[in-house]
From Swiss-Prot:
It is an enzyme of class 7 (translocase). Keywords: Electron transport, Membrane, Mitochondrion, Mitochondrion inner membrane, NAD, Respiratory chain, Translocase, Transmembrane, Transmembrane helix, Transport, Ubiquinone. This is NADH-ubiquinone oxidoreductase chain 1. The keyword Kinase does not apply. It comes from Aedes aegypti. The chain crosses the membrane at residues 7-27, 73-93, 104-124, 150-170, 175-195, 226-246, 250-270, 293-313. One of its GO terms (cellular component) is mitochondrial inner membrane. PROSITE patterns: COMPLEX1_ND1_1, COMPLEX1_ND1_2. Belongs to the complex I subunit 1 family. HAMAP family: NDH1_NuoH.
Length: 313
């Protein structure tokens, strides 16, 4: 019975994430519209509320094309696997009951984000297009570089908390949010999340000016829609994780969803305001700026933990 309830809970979560992704795309188009001093989509339904659903119908009813020289099986399955991974990562969502919230949630998150690299790489390689391959290689290098900083930031909090469970982040932030005394770390985390999810200003995998459309250049209709869904699902997850780790929000309060919306809005706001970074500067930022900073904070947290333990015993 418990297994059945957990299964139903996770299916409901996946459906809600999908609906959230639909409205996140609408929010993005609206916000970008107002940033560029124009209206966003406002024709379909009331104020364009049904626009994402008409987009979905359009994308999934289009003809599925594939390049003759592509490695068809890999080409076909990499978007599906990509979406599967970005939905699987939601299983580590810190709920107390009826979901798979487990003690090693942080480790699970790191494992799944590492696996996400392969889908992009395989999608780029199997298309058998130079543009797609270059985009895939860029995405892999970028994701691996920024994952180091993400892992170190998480590790520093784990040293402080002494547990891999996301639920413990709530308990430790009952009186003060981590963002208060780790503001620089919060900014590093946010920038790393932008790089992880291939968003502006780090969207080199999809650099239109250089690579046509990057690793998804050969994808159309359903395949493109699945890659798109995976990207926006991971944006929502990263926003959720930011509010859990730094803003200490209890997942059962309405404030948690408000914070999640604000962080998602920041993702869109950055896209509307910042130009694309230069690739060498991106790598410079990852290895010479973010890595030393997260290492310094790691040692700082180890020192704090040792100090607390020495005071106790």
């Amino acid at each position: 019975m418990d297994y059945l309830l957990s299964l139903i809970g996770s299916l409901l979560l996946v459906i809600c994430v999908m609906v959230g992704v639909a409205f996140l795309t609408l929010l993005e188009r609206k916000v970008l519209g107002y940033i560029q001093i124009r209206k966003g989509p406002n024709k379909v339904g009331f104020m364009g509320l049904l626009q994402p659903f008409s987009d979905a119908v359009k994308l999934f009813t289009k003809e599925q094309t594939y390049p003759l020289l592509s490695n068809y099986i890999f080409y076909y399955f990499s978007p599906i696997f990509s979406l599967f991974l970005s939905l699987l990562i939601w299983m580590s969502m810190p709920y107390l009951i009826k979901l798979y919230s487990f003690n090693l949630g942080v480790l699970f998150f790191l494992c799944i984000t590492s696996l996400g690299v392969y889908t992009v790489m395989v999608a780029g390689w199997s298309s058998n297009s130079n543009y797609a391959l270059l985009g895939g290689l860029r995405a892999v290098a970028q994701t691996i570089s920024y994952e180091v900083s993400l892992a170190l930031i998480l590790l520093s909090f784990i040293f402080l908390i002494g547990n891999y469970n996301f639920l413990n982040f709530f308990m430790y932030q009952k009186y003060m949010w981590f963002i208060v005394f780790c503001f620089p770390l919060g900014l590093v985390w946010f920038a790393s999340c932008l790089a992880e999810t291939n968003r502006t200003p780090f969207d080199f995998a999809e650099g239109e000016s250089e690579l046509v459309s990057g690793f998804n250049v050969e994808y159309s209709s359903g395949g493109f829609a699945l890659i798109f869904l995976a990207e926006y699902s991971s944006i929502l997850f990263m926003s959720m994780l930011f509010s859990v780790i730094f803003l200490g929000s209890d997942i059962y309060s309405i404030l948690f969803f408000f914070k999640l919306t604000i962080i998602s809005f920041f993702f869109i706001w950055v896209r509307g305001t910042l130009p694309r970074f230069r690739y060498d500067k991106l790598m410079y930022l990852a290895w010479k700026s973010f890595l030393p900073m997260s290492l310094n904070y790691l040692f700082f947290f180890i020192g704090v933990k040792i100090f607390i333990l020495s005071m106790l015993f």
